A protein has these predicted regions:
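Beta1-alpha1 glycine-rich phosphate/pyrophosphate-binding loop at the start
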Residues: 2-86, 170, 177-220, 454
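Rossmann-like dinucleotide-binding core of oxidoreductases
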Residues: 164-220, 227, 238, 336-355, ...
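FAD-site-proximal beta/loop scaffold in flavoenzymes
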Residues: 130-161, 252, 263, 272-344
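A Rossmann-like FAD-binding core segment of flavoenzymes
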Residues: 37, 79-94, 187-307, 313
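Short glycine-rich anion-binding loops that position phosphate/pyrophosphate groups of nucleotides
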Residues: 18, 117-120, 183, 285-287
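C-terminal, flexible cofactor-proximal segment of oxidoreductases
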Residues: 350-454
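FAD-binding core/adjacent interface of flavoenzyme oxidoreductases
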Residues: 2-3, 7, 11, 77-169, ...
Length: 454
């Protein structure tokens, strides 16, 4: 059996679920092996627990409670924080962008795991990209919460009815997991804090979900998806199906009704608009630009991989998670971009990498779903768990228990649990936190132009 004689370097690109799970599995095998060096490169020095992002946006969970420093959860892996400029699979080099404070560097690897995830897809609509809010990063959640509070503050004292309506209309684009859970949390927040704004009535608050398909939560059990739709409507959320966004200028979103039968020309009667200052875009994802401009063979921007999760023509290079294209042999469609699949691929990629180093047999990746879970509002959820379809309070309780158990550290488990308990007994905070750096020179200049008035 061939053994490693020289020190080999395994480099993992990314710091999301797939990257961290892969690193932990490799640490358990090679953590004390002086012949193997583990390296991780990520833009953020933390793992973000994305399933709870909507609860951060609604103010239920504190921001820092869903982030986990890489250096504390992958202690035997050397970490580089930086943006990846280029991956050269022929020279086996990963190059990082330089900054104003540090130079660009290149890192050599012997084995590579690409787990760079994805970014929001705006489908080429520059105005939407410029003006919409997203739900992908921790910053997105904080900015959205601030925006919601700001809109309530503006509407409270606004006398122009049209402008006031635009403040209180909140449009969520996308009826998948992210969109539906965001809409539910958003409505919960609005209803909870409305009492602090006397002039705003319940009927003034509008949360609208726009979905291009004919159903929400595609891929979920149809009966459960229908249950979710009805519950959301009972909460006052307007769900509009077969609606595609064509533009958003920051004041008005233009939408097109999608017909069953394609037409050569667009009937103007199918075009309408909604006045809103806040559009939340959760309608799709796309691989990061590093993948798109790489030398790897891609399809729809994703890296093509084989049954062992390896990149063809590049032995020892694996791709997992949202950036990899792996087709479900049953449906003949790519697997959805979920954390559950990313973690399953990460475990298999680590196992096959270990087999490759030890010159043993690799295994094909076969995915077995553990179920699906979604929260659709206060104390209500839907779940397919252990082959059983569940809805209502029990599904909500299962969601909380399952995701609480998946939080990597005990201290953060405790903090999130306490956040949930506090939310049961106390009101949500309506403070709007502004993190923009103070512009000192501009402020002093403006001050000099006026007399001191006290």
């Amino acid at each position: 059996m061939w053994l490693v004689k020289n020190k080999k370097k395994i480099v993992i690109l990314g710091s999301g679920f797939a990257a961290v799970e892969c690193a932990k599995k490799l640490e358990s095998e090679f953590g004390n092996d002086s012949e193997i060096e583990l390296v991780m490169i990520g833009e953020d020095n933390f793992l973000l627990f994305t399933p709870m992002l909507p609860q951060v946006a609604s103010g239920m969970i504190e921001t820092r409670h869903i982030v986990f420093p890489i250096r504390t959860i992958c202690k035997k892996t050397k970490f580089y924080e930086g943006r990846i400029k280029n991956v050269d699979p022929y020279g086996k080099l990963v190059t990082l962008w330089g900054t104003g404070d540090k130079r660009s560097i290149s890192i050599h690897y012997d084995f590579l795991v690409v787990a760079l995830g994805s970014e929001t897809n705006f489908f080429g609509m520059a105005d939407v990209e410029k003006n919409a809010y997203t739900m992908k990063t921790l910053n997105d959640a904080v900015m959205l919460r601030n925006r919601i509070i700001d809109m309530l503050e503006q509407a409270e004292n606004e006398t122009n009815p049209i402008l006031r309506k635009s403040f209180l209309n909140f449009v969520v684009v996308g009826g998948g997991f992210a969109g539906i859970e965001t809409a539910g949390e958003l409505m919960d927040l609005l209803l909870d804090v409305r009492k602090y704004y006397p002039s705003i009535q319940k009927d003034d608050l509008k949360v609208i979900v726009l979905e291009a398909m004919g159903e929400i939560l595609p891929g979920f059990n149809k009966k459960l998806a229908e249950f979710a739709k009805q519950k959301l409507k009972e909460r006052g959320i307007d769900i509009q199906l077969k609606k595609a966004v064509t533009s958003f200028d920051g004041n008005e979103v233009t939408i097109k009704t999608l017909d069953e039968t394609p037409k050569d020309s667009i009937d103007q009667s199918e075009i309408n608009s909604i006045i809103t200052k806040t559009l939340i875009w959760t309608a799709g994802i796309t691989p990061v630009n590093t993948i798109k401009r790489s030398m790897f063979k891609t399809e729809k921007g994703k890296i093509i991989i084989n049954d062992f999760l390896e990149v063809p023509k590049f032995p020892g290079v694996f791709a997992i998670g949202d950036c990899a294209l792996f087709v479900d042999p049953i449906t003949n469609r790519p697997f959805p971009p979920t954390a559950q699949i990313a973690e399953a691929q990460a475990k298999m990629a680590a196992k096959n990498l270990i087999s490759l180093i030890k010159n043993s047999e690799k295994e094909k990746f076969v995915y077995h779903s553990k179920g699906q879970l979604a929260i659709i509002g206060k104390r209500t959820g839907i779940a397919t768990f252990l082959g059983v379809n569940i809805s209502g309070f029990l599904a909500w309780l299962i969601w909380r228990n399952v995701y609480l158990s998946k939080i990597p550290t005990f201290d953060k488990k405790t903090r999130v649990f306490l956040d949930w308990v506090i939310d049961l007994f106390f009101d949500r905070d309506v403070s709007r936190l502004n993190f923009i750096k103070r512009e000192t020179e501009k402020e002093y200049k403006e001050l000099d132009e006026v007399d001191d008035v006290w």
